[in-house]
């Protein structure tokens, strides 16, 4: 396997995680929901990685807070939910349900999962047996329903 998935445990009041996928041969990386840029920058510098993509699951500040600084430091493409473009001005690659895109030779599938927010998306990578689901699903349950309905969240969790 040419990839390594890293979990950055962010020590803030919301106890966020930042996921980073490293492509070992190229030393390129993608970061998912970078709440704080400094954690990402420090990790990339310590491991000689170049950040090339940012993937966002939804518009909440604890998932997009580090994007402006990372955009200043790296030449990155920013992927995120088309339905939340008005709330996430950084997105230059808007995504919608059942769309796919690439990171190196990985195929990333996008699923819309409204409930936590109306435009929430998740990233499914079959080759890594991984689902990056933002605030849709937690180890002890699902995320809070802020914008959507409980029916939408139920449908999203069943996808």
Where are the predicted features?
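Active-site HxH/HxHxD metal-binding segment of metal-dependent hydrolases
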Residues: 14-15, 29, 36-112, 129
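Conserved beta-strand hairpin/beta-sheet module of binuclear metal-dependent hydrolase folds
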Residues: 1-49, 123-134, 140
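Non-transmembrane, interaction-prone segments in cytosolic or luminal domains
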Residues: 13-22, 56-59, 77, 135, ...
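Short amphipathic alpha-helical surface micro-motifs
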Residues: 1-3, 76-78, 151-153
């Amino acid at each position: 396997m040419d990839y390594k998935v890293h979990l950055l445990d962010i020590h803030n009041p919301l106890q966020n995680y930042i996921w980073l996928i490293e492509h070992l041969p190229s030393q390129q990386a993608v970061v998912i929901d970078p709440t704080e840029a400094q954690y990402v920058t420090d990790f990339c510098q310590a491991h000689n990685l170049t950040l090339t993509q940012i993937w966002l699951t939804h518009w909440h500040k604890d998932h997009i807070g580090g994007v402006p600084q990372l955009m200043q430091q790296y030449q990155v493409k920013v992927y995120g939910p088309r339905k939340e473009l008005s709330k996430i001005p950084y997105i230059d690659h808007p995504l919608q349900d059942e769309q796919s895109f690439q990171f190196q030779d990985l195929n990333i599938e996008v699923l819309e999962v409204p409930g936590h927010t109306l435009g929430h998306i998740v990233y499914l990578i079959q080759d890594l047996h991984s689902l990056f689901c933002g605030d849709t699903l937690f180890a002890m349950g699902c995320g809070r329903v802020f914008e959507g309905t409980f029916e939408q969240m139920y449908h999203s969790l069943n996808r």
